[in-house]
């Protein structure tokens, strides 16, 4: 069983601890949809580079951060093999495992009860040195950004050239056919010329890549 955790960075408030059978997209999204509806949308989410957060697609896109981008949520990835960049989260995760997972509960329902109990105590009973020996629940403030009923279409500046990604994840641009990502099939992207023949490719406000139209090559 995988534990899916969501934590407010500044207050240490633990938004969710859910036991999932895998790191697959569907389970992670279901947890996040619930969290976003209850607590509002964050401005940015920090994560490691594992599934379901990062893939080998352009800009490391995954189904999850495509959805975040559509919601106007930024994605801050720590550097590969640098868990110290997410130190407080890693420490909390170790504490969670020590107190709830070893030994494991008899079944998934019992394990979730342990997770729920840990979250309640962590948020409302335990003082934390990093926040002045206060509890996370005493400092937490709900986000004012609400989960939208439907996703908004991207709006690009007027000087951008707009294209729709084709069914096979390809982009046809100036007599060149370039592969972007199957994760973007049907999505509208914006191209902004930043130098002679050099273009920035955007998905909403996310920079996907730079394109040199002379060579047809994409770069980070």
Question: What are these language model-derived features?
Answer:
Residues 1-3, 9-121, 210-211, 215:
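RNase H-like DDE/DDD metal-dependent nuclease/strand-transfer catalytic core used by mobile genetic elements
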Residues 7-8, 193:
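Hydrophobic alpha-helical segments, especially N-terminal targeting/anchoring helices
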Residues 123-220:
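C-terminal, beta-rich DNA-binding module of retroviral/retroelements integrases
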């Amino acid at each position: 069983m995988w534990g899916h955790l969501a934590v407010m960075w500044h207050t240490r408030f633990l938004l969710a601890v859910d036991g999932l059978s895998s790191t697959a997209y569907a389970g992670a999204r279901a947890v996040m949809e619930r969290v976003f509806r209850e607590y509002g949308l964050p401005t940015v989410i920090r994560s490691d580079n594992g599934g379901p957060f990062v893939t080998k697609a352009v800009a490391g896109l995954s189904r999850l951060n495509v959805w975040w981008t559509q919601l106007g949520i930024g994605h801050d990835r720590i550097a590969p093999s640098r868990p110290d960049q997410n130190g407080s989260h890693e420490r909390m995760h170790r504490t969670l495992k020590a107190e709830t997972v070893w030994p494991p509960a008899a079944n998934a329902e019992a394990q979730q009860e342990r997770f729920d109990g840990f979250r309640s105590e962590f948020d409302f009973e335990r003082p934390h040195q990093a926040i002045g020996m206060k509890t996370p629940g005493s400092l937490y403030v709900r986000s004012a950004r609400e989960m939208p009923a439907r996703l908004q279409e991207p709006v690009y500046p007027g000087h951008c050239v707009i294209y729709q990604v084709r069914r096979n994840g390809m982009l046809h641009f100036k007599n060149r056919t370039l592969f972007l990502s199957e994760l973007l099939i049907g999505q509208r992207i914006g191209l902004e010329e930043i130098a002679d023949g050099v273009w920035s490719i955007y998905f909403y406000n996310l920079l996907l890549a730079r394109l040199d139209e002379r060579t047809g090559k994409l770069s980070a």
